[in-house]
Amino acid sequence: MEKKESLDSSLKEIVSVCKRRGFVYPGSEIYGGLSNTFDYGPYGVELLQNLKQLWWKFFVHLREDVVGLDSSILLNPKVWEASGHVSNFTDPLIDCKNCKTRIRADKFLEDQKGEGFATGLTLEKMNQVIKENNFSCPNCGQRGTFTEARDFNLMFKTSHGASAEDSLDIYLRPETAQGIFLNFKNVVSTTRRKIPFGIAQIGKSFRNEIMARQFVFRTREFEQMEMEFFCEPGTQKEWFSHWVNYCMNWLTEQVGVKKENLRIREHEKEELSFYSEGTSDIEFKYNFGWGELWGIASRTDYDLNQHQKFSGEDLKYQDQVQNKKYVPFVVEPALGVNRLFLAVVTDAYQEEKLPDGEIRTVLRFSPKIAPVKVAVFPLMKKDGLLEKSREIFADLSKLGNIEYDDSGAIGKRYRRQDEIGTPFCITVDYDTLKDDTVTVRERDSMAQERVSVTRLRNWLFERL
């Protein structure tokens, strides 16, 4: 039986509302689960779709200099040799000899000695610190039972082929970026794009994390929204600055994340990825502390040069204006969809005490990303209120995901929608049958307003 991973206490309220209201479920739950796997429920998948569509709108559709791509998860294994992932995509691993628990050494040391302590430490130095401090195992409590730290490759390996004789060892991709680099030449040829331009995609990636934890923040299966922006060498710093600012503005102005919950952190030289000349993270203040949300990296010409070398293909760009050929430099904004999901739920979550002493839990999502835009309630299930409510519901469905609910007391229906994050609730009552108006209740202020049915859709459209 696989060990259950303990839940960070700071996340319990977030996890509770996500499970209770159908945002996130434990994976394979009826079979006892599988650690660090999650399924997104009806409201979770709506929130994810809204976030992805909003990203695609502002990073592809509203830009003349970016196009889209959907590359394969399974790639020729030579791709990962060329990219450096086979030899360099590792984390330091230690084992407890007593209970067999596997631990990521650098994160363990930072838990013991403070954030940033392990930055730049070699395996030898990590081993020295662990021995000198005689740390106890966080699982069994025994001291002095750790193995020597060693590199652990994070890529999932599988077989490609129907029989052992002709099967090929391949990997599930650990990032979506390489599929973009492989198609750089195809995109230039078929779209006639001129540098500077970007290629964006949304897709699943897989990393065999040693310590997958903190709910959906660090999972072995995750989704990325990545873009590789190709530019002329010497202009990458200007574009790097552009994308850091563009990404930050998108989070605050479009998604609605509070500015005080975001910060930009520049990587130290010792913590840079093997392909990067400079990286800045947009970090979010999660319940467990600051964590990477969005990484913007200057990947130079590393990837295209490596694929030229290993494949034999000429991946240089022919600049017709300057009449010269060069390998473009690349700036990469890479955003984890699951981390963004956790960030917006955390940012929106609030508990407030009402005048009657009741505690109200509410998710204050921006209307742009709210999984349900409007909920329609008949006050009673009789006297024509159901029919009128259904008529209004059908008319409003053109605005997006609209929910209909005729079960339970109105107050409880309001509370349920508060926890889902629905911006507006509409109650159809007996006055509706008299004067064709409804009560519209706003989520954050709980203020109520009578609005005529004839102008209801436009009234909501202006606010969603």
Swiss-Prot record:
Entry protein name: Glycine--tRNA ligase
One Pfam family it belongs to: tRNA-synt_2b
Species of origin: Leptospira borgpetersenii serovar Hardjo-bovis (strain JB197)
Keywords attached to this entry: Aminoacyl-tRNA synthetase, ATP-binding, Cytoplasm, Ligase, Nucleotide-binding, Protein biosynthesis
GO cellular component, one term: cytoplasm
Lineage: Bacteria, Pseudomonadati, Spirochaetota, Spirochaetia, Leptospirales
Entry-linked HAMAP family: Gly_tRNA_synth_B (MF_00253_B)
Sequence similarity: Belongs to the class-II aminoacyl-tRNA synthetase family.
Location(s) in or outside the cell: Cytoplasm
